[in-house]
């Protein structure tokens, strides 16, 4: 066989192999590559969506956290205001109660002072009558001299 015939036969076999490969082998390979590329693209798209959703969720969480912090700060401020109001009310009531107690004590002391003065006047009047009795060596009649004794009490 000559070199030309061998070369020609190999060329024919090569083209038959190429045609067979293009017809039967190449389509499943390209289909598998296309499916793989599609899966990779879907995976990347899903990753991008997940990344976007994560960013959105993080934003919502931050907003909720800020809202909760604001609400807690507001509640704390309200509690402090209520505590101050309660303390101020207690101080006011204590001051009023103290004023009432002081007023009652002053009133009681004034009454005791008036009673003590009245008792002292009566005692002084009785002593004055006794002294006058002894000076005069006679008995002074309280009923007869009631006007004189009452004037003496008021002067003392």
UniProtKB/Swiss-Prot annotation:
Give the record's GO CC terms.
Answer: plasma membrane; proton-transporting ATP synthase complex
Q: What PANTHER family would the database entry show?
A: ATP SYNTHASE SUBUNIT B, ATP SYNTHASE SUBUNIT B', CHLOROPLASTIC
Instruction: Report TM segments.
Output: 7-27
Reply yes or no: does the keyword Ribonucleoprotein apply. Answer: no
Q: What Gene3D superfamilies does the record tag this protein with?
A: 6.10.250.1580
Q: Which Pfam families match?
A: ATP-synt_B
Name by which UniProt lists this protein: ATP synthase subunit b
How is the quaternary structure described? Answer: F-type ATPases have 2 components, F(1) - the catalytic core - and F(0) - the membrane proton channel. F(1) has five subunits: alpha(3), beta(3), gamma(1), delta(1), epsilon(1). F(0) has four main subunits: a(1), b(2) and c(10-14). The alpha and beta chains form an alternating ring which encloses part of the gamma chain. F(1) is attached to F(0) by a central stalk formed by the gamma and epsilon chains, while a peripheral stalk is formed by the delta and b chains.
Family, similarity comment: Belongs to the ATPase B chain family.
**Subcellular localization(s) per the UniProt record:** Cell inner membrane
Question: Which GO molecular-function terms appear in the entry?
Answer: proton-transporting ATP synthase activity, rotational mechanism; proton-transporting ATPase activity, rotational mechanism
Task: Please state the protein's primary subcellular location.
Answer: membrane
Bilayer topology reads: Single-pass membrane protein
What function is annotated for this protein?
F(1)F(0) ATP synthase produces ATP from ADP in the presence of a proton or sodium gradient. F-type ATPases consist of two structural domains, F(1) containing the extramembraneous catalytic core and F(0) containing the membrane proton channel, linked together by a central stalk and a peripheral stalk. During catalysis, ATP synthesis in the catalytic domain of F(1) is coupled via a rotary mechanism of the central stalk subunits to proton translocation. Component of the F(0) channel, it forms part of the peripheral stalk, linking F(1) to F(0).
State if Nucleotide-binding is listed as a keyword: no
Keywords in alphabetical order: ATP synthesis, Cell inner membrane, Cell membrane, CF(0), Hydrogen ion transport, Ion transport, Membrane, Transmembrane, Transmembrane helix, Transport
Gene encoding it?
atpF
């Amino acid at each position: 066989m000559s070199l030309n015939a061998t070369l020609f036969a190999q060329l024919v076999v090569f083209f038959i192999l190429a045609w067979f490969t293009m017809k039967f082998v190449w389509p499943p390979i390209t289909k598998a590559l296309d499916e793989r590329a599609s899966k990779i693209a879907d995976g990347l798209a899903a990753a991008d969506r997940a990344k976007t959703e994560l960013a959105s969720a993080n934003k919502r969480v931050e907003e909720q956290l800020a809202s909760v912090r604001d609400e807690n700060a507001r509640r704390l401020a309200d509690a402090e205001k209520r505590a101050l109001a309660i303390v101020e009310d207690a101080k006011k009531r204590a001051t009023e109660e103290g004023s009432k107690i002081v007023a009652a004590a002053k009133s009681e002391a004034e009454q005791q002072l008036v009673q003590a003065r009245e008792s002292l006047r009566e005692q002084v009047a009785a002593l004055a009558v006794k002294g006058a009795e002894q000076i005069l060596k006679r008995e002074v009649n309280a009923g007869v001299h009631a006007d004189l004794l009452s004037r003496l009490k008021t002067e003392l």
